[in-house]
């Protein structure tokens, strides 16, 4: 039975006639786009918004720019003491199927729940007295309860922690006959590790014998036996997070999933990188937590937050993980092992036990099919079909997950060991003999909001709390933030991180630090007096190693505080004094009383009672989030609110007026003035003038570049890509306070980086002296700077390769550039060699540096516009992508263009040759002028302009539109109108060239050549699979495609039925069936008059052409699709819902003065469609039919057309991911609706303009 959501779907997802198709109505979550605009559980939303566009540029290389590799440490290598075992616990957990409101893709709910992170701990420790005395002479005692809310950072690199051991109850693969008791809530056991790119997985110590029992498989599985026999190991878990993915809490809060869902990608030809890249480009529709194949586990979203992978009901509950298809026995076995290991790790980490939900809808391990069956909100049935194709089953996979979990929990013997005894559960803990490995005991982890200083004598930093020894550290006697507390057995650890950046250092033992509780910082706006010489610190409770500066001047100075934090019982304030900023204990500050202002009459001119002084200044400042606004003049009484906060600006002037001090801030990179700000509203630093430098450094991947020195997160210009240290070429340097910032370029990205993140590369070895030659003399005299040039080059077949920088010692393979022509924009001498920078054929994108010895180079002249027709010679070199192009860059061969007419639009000189750019055979490119012959002059002929009504599509963005035909001066580029409709009203032929006069999409009238127009625009996209392959996938689905061989009787379609229905070549040749490829997200600018003629006699929709036209343009929807939707929903405009009514006292009133209309059936639920539909229309304010058309179109567009599947064919067959997210089961669904749309086009007197046709291999 179809499930309703927000809107009563027509039974064809807009078009299908009653009884003509079976439609899947519940397309949510992984199937539809979630409204993110009002969700209050989004974390770091400002930063996400600011970095989205920059992050998207990295999508095509999904796992290259990983700053670190996540390592799951297997705690199974640490054998637990028998005393730590508990009795068997039969704990049943019942999944709550109640729909929970929250912005988790549930389309019926608009309420957002503000879930907050929950700090959890299972151990209670007694208060500890701290007898350490600071240099300030007061004692810091840790005896105060801190009840402030802690913001927990859940994205620590994960390591399989070791929670309390509990027996796992294996559920048989059969429905339960007895009621299931409610499941006990278990405390999540956080993953205990730090960010560490160098962390390595532990190697299990050789343990030929163990006292643990061997696991007894619950199902027979040759693949699982193969995995066990070969003792397959799971790979390191890689993190490839994307900053612009939304972060929403689960329904129980951040870091509290209730289980894991098994998916498969349903794409037999894709790879793990391809799946991730596709997901990142289409994350608005769906994204998951991780992908697994036979070689890799890549986590793509933090598991502490929900993903959009399993529908509106399942998304706020479960972790979603996709299995990428593999094609041989060994690879499939490895992928199952990898999935089971990842799933067991997640269950262990979050304190969940394996519990299959497949047969009763209750548990922690689900398939997508089980979610569809028991919870709803989705209709997928994976991964059963894929598993069956490898003679495997979900039951076998679950058995492997269960075994992995028990191994990790130390309940059964690891693979590769021999079990000697089968221990019984003691009624009382006994004292075992000394184990061969250390006992771990119970692990508890809790969030912490404190600070700590590492003592000079310590045990080192630990990557995980399971490590036997720590690594030596120099980070002693400094104050760090503490974000986590962990207790393992009798040991207690703190996770310490840099106070200001959040960079994690590692775990330290409790006895190795001086610890203090800390409350969260709060913003303040208070002035104090401070004595000269008082130290400022970079952190509160800072040490001598963290001094930011000293207060200068004579006599008491003014310290303007902007932030305050309580450390134990002491108060520290952050602020500025004389251009320096830092933290000071409140004990060193004296509160200054605010002067009482004396009322004065309002002057007609700015007051001059107070002395004004203005001086030039060279500094930088960041405006605090809390401020008094921007002042146009320092005489203004109040400032204007500003959003330019927490950004770095240049300061050019300083002004004092009475007791107030102001800074004049401007954009750092342009002359744009922002305004005056009060001194107390900024964090200010002195700055020296920038100086030019020419220096090379190395920088680590992931390092941020900023658009300004001392930039903030709002001014990120990018991040360093690549693996291993990269070369940063600095060209400018500026000192901000005592820090040095350098501006330069790395891997094509430019920006500012603190010198602290740069390293000077080791000096290269001196080369053996060579005798002087003419080449060397040239190299010595050539300036060592980059020159801008205009040249063109062909890469030789045998070349030394391409470099990202001339400083790279080793070039990358340049074979793919060989025997091709590229533009040259830069030239630089380096040592004895000369290099040039090659750009792609569009001039825009630099490819890399080549040695000139590897190129044939010619000078390139300026492009000149021309308008001339030529005849192509019988013997010619063809049409090329680039002037002086090679055989590898030919668009049309010489035979294809010989004796043809070439319409040139511009020309350029290459050395002594001239190349012309133009059009021939509907293709554009370059031809050598030697291959062309200019036609003999003929007498101009001009026909009279005649009326001609037709809507074309502009197909040549490189063409022009004209004020008058054949005008050489009054012409303008068509680039902005490419692929847009052009409504023609007149036709004229001049000198054999047909011209059309009509209206552009912006309403402007113009002349365009017929060669730049097309009656329809057809695009083809390659699928990558054969028709047989995709048809086999569709025919093999658990829910088979349907066909009516006898009217009214549905049966399963066979392979031939499906293949016939999916054959795009056949469909594209049929004038009606072709319309299933019509793009429904592209309006055609059909005239309002034509629409009104078609709507004549269509009830309240009559004469609503203007409304449909407006709706189509506003929301990007094909007009005919929108009209057909409305006609079917309203019974050709005659339904009461369309004619309008009101709802008064929850009753429908049809004779009210004000009526509300609903022409698309939105929210017209089946139980009472008229009342519900009118209520929705009233809430939306649709008190006219035109408002209902325009307002309803927005919903139609967002719910269907804009969801990614923008043609009827894509809606039915989803060729990009066959067998998934399909809107119907009837094999004839797209055909039926294509005929309906074609019929409407015929009645309107138009044809479809935009088609998107898939092509199979």
UniProtKB/Swiss-Prot annotation:
It holds the Pfam family Glucosaminidase. CDD domains: PGRP (cd06583). Residues 444-518, 520-594, 613-687, 689-763, 785-860, 862-937, 944-1018 form the GW domain. Residues 173-208, 419-440 have a biased composition (Low complexity). GO terms for biological process: cell wall organization; peptidoglycan catabolic process. GO terms for molecular function: amidase activity; mannosyl-glycoprotein endo-beta-N-acetylglucosaminidase activity; N-acetylmuramoyl-L-alanine amidase activity. Its EC number is 3.5.1.28, 3.2.1.96. Residues 1-29 form the signal peptide. Residues 99-150, 173-217, 417-441 are annotated as: Disordered. One of its GO terms (cellular component) is extracellular region. Keywords: Cell wall biogenesis/degradation, Hydrolase, Multifunctional enzyme, Repeat, Secreted, Signal. It is found in: Secreted. SUPFAM superfamilies: N-acetylmuramoyl-L-alanine amidase-like (SSF55846), Prokaryotic SH3-related domain (SSF82057). It catalyses: Hydrolyzes the link between N-acetylmuramoyl residues and L-amino acid residues in certain cell-wall glycopeptides; an N(4)-(oligosaccharide-(1->3)-[oligosaccharide-(1->6)]-beta-D-Man-(1->4)-beta-D-GlcNAc-(1->4)-alpha-D-GlcNAc)-L-asparaginyl-[protein] + H2O = an oligosaccharide-(1->3)-[oligosaccharide-(1->6)]-beta-D-Man-(1->4)-D-GlcNAc + N(4)-(N-acetyl-beta-D-glucosaminyl)-L-asparaginyl-[protein]. Residues 777-1257 are annotated as: Endo-beta-N-acetylglucosaminidase. Undergoes proteolytic processing to generate the two extracellular lytic enzymes, probably at the septal region on the cell surface. Residues 197-776 are annotated as: N-acetylmuramoyl-L-alanine amidase. Residues 99-137 have a biased composition (Polar residues). Oligomer; forms a ring structure at the cell surface which is important for efficient partitioning of daughter cells after cell division. The GW domains are responsible for directing the proteins to the septal region. Endohydrolysis of the di-N-acetylchitobiosyl unit in high-mannose glycopeptides and glycoproteins containing the -[(Man)5(GlcNAc)2]-Asn structure. One N-acetyl-D-glucosamine residue remains attached to the protein; the rest of the oligosaccharide is released intact. Cleaves the peptidoglycan connecting the daughter cells at the end of the cell division cycle, resulting in the separation of the two newly divided cells. Acts as an autolysin in penicillin-induced lysis. In the N-terminal section; belongs to the N-acetylmuramoyl-L-alanine amidase 2 family. This is Bifunctional autolysin. It comes from Staphylococcus aureus (strain MRSA252). The gene is atl.
